[in-house]
């Protein structure tokens, strides 16, 4: 059983290191998405900054406490000493601890009490000019994001293998080549990626959407073929753009769905900034609101790889896993058990005959001569 008191003490020991890391983000350049095709409205610039730091600055041992609705409102970045990826249980414990810690601070400030500790004063500075009720709302909007620098670097390396062929496919469909970067947002260019929601492959198609563009059966899955799935992604993105008329909306639709994005566009006159700020459609949550900013951040890092990952020039391109789209049918439990018993009896009979013919009888572990 985990000792909660010990864990809390351990977290307090990390506090000074955490405060030192806060604000160490390294992106101050021009947003890559300020081209005509991929505009970056002022409303989402802070979100793009946030995701650049997540992808290229903060490691898997950095935990960023922030506001879900205003991701640029960062309360703390806690660095976990050590090396390697934290275990799942440890990461979940840290998230729970940090969420509770800042919920307590925000709820205390919501009572109208004057900030009395260093951390309370630091949090209060983020709410200058706002009423105490803003603290209460913020307490319900806490989120902890783990850094992804190591994962993103691995994705950059894998992208070297796939990028040329993917770019050719996208150009064939009349798509801007920068859209290939979405594969990094989706899966880190990992062809065998699987999500908890059942999405599969580099482009993370669900079974339902995938069947509209690929062959997916009980024993065959084209989502595991990077070439086939890339063509499907290109067709979907082309269709999204033709239906919605802008890349911010078309890219959002890749995550949220075309129908839902069309509804949001109709409600707000196609204004992406208003949609992100005000649309309350079903399941239009954190992931969908941040999908286009994540894409712009990924483009920024890809286009400035030498700046964010200067050691990459010396790294070798990894060989991708072999493509396997066909699966042998699985026997039912009853049939498998029957087959096992039948095979076991047949082999036992064969051994008995062989033993009799050679003059040996097997009894337990010993072999006795007649």
Model-predicted segments: where are they?
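Alpha-helical scaffolds flanking conserved acidic
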Residues: 99, 176-183, 200, 247-252
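Bacterial N-terminal signal peptides
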Residues: 15-25
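Short, surface-exposed glycine/acidic/tryptophan-bearing loops
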Residues: 137, 193-213
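A generic alpha-helix surface/boundary motif
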Residues: 163-164, 183, 204, 208, ...
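Extracytoplasmic and endomembrane cell-envelope/extracellular-matrix remodeling and assembly machinery
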Residues: 118-121, 125-155, 160-161, 173, ...
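An acidic, Gly/Ser/Thr/Pro-rich helix-cap/linker signature
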Residues: 29-171, 339, 348-349
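Bacterial N-terminal signal peptides that target proteins for export
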Residues: 3-15
């Amino acid at each position: 059983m985990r000792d909660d008191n010990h864990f809390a003490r351990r977290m307090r020991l990390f506090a000074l290191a955490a405060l030192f890391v806060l604000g160490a983000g390294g992106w101050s350049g021009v947003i890559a998405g300020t081209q005509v095709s991929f505009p970056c409205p002022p409303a989402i610039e802070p979100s793009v900054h946030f995701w650049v730091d997540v992808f290229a600055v903060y490691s898997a041992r950095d935990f960023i406490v922030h506001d879900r609705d205003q991701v640029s409102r960062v309360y703390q970045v806690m660095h976990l000493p050590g090396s390697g990826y934290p275990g799942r249980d440890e990461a979940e414990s840290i998230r729970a601890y940090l969420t509770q810690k800042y919920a307590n601070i925000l709820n205390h400030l919501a009572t109208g009490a004057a900030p009395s500790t260093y951390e309370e004063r630091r949090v209060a500075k983020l709410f200058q000019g706002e009423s105490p009720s803003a603290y209460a709302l913020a307490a319900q909007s806490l989120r902890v994001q783990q850094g992804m620098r190591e994962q993103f670097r691995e994705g950059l390396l894998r992208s070297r293998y796939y990028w040329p062929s993917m770019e050719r496919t996208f150009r064939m469909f009349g798509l801007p080549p920068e859209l290939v970067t979405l594969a990094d947002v989706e899966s880190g260019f990992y062809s065998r990626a699987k999500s908890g929601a059942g999405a599969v492959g580099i482009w993370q198609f669900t079974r339902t959407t995938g069947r509209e563009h690929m062959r997916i059966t009980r024993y065959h899955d084209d989502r595991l073929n990077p070439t086939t799935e890339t063509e499907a992604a290109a067709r979907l993105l082309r269709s999204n753009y033709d239906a919605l008329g802008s890349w911010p909306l078309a890219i959002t639709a890749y995550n949220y769905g075309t129908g839902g994005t069309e509804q949001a566009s109709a409600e707000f006159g196609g204004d992406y900034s208003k949609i992100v700020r005000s649309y309350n459609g079903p399941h239009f949550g954190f992931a969908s609101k941040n999908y286009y900013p994540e894409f712009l951040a990924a483009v920024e890092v890809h286009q400035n790889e030498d700046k964010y990952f200067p050691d990459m020039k010396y790294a070798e391109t990894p060989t991708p896993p072999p493509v396997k789209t066909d699966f042998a049918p699985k026997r039912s439990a009853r049939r498998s058990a029957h087959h096992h018993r039948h095979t076991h009896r047949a082999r036992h009979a064969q051994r008995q005959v062989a033993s009799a013919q050679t003059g040996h009888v097997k009894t337990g572990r010993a072999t006795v001569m007649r």
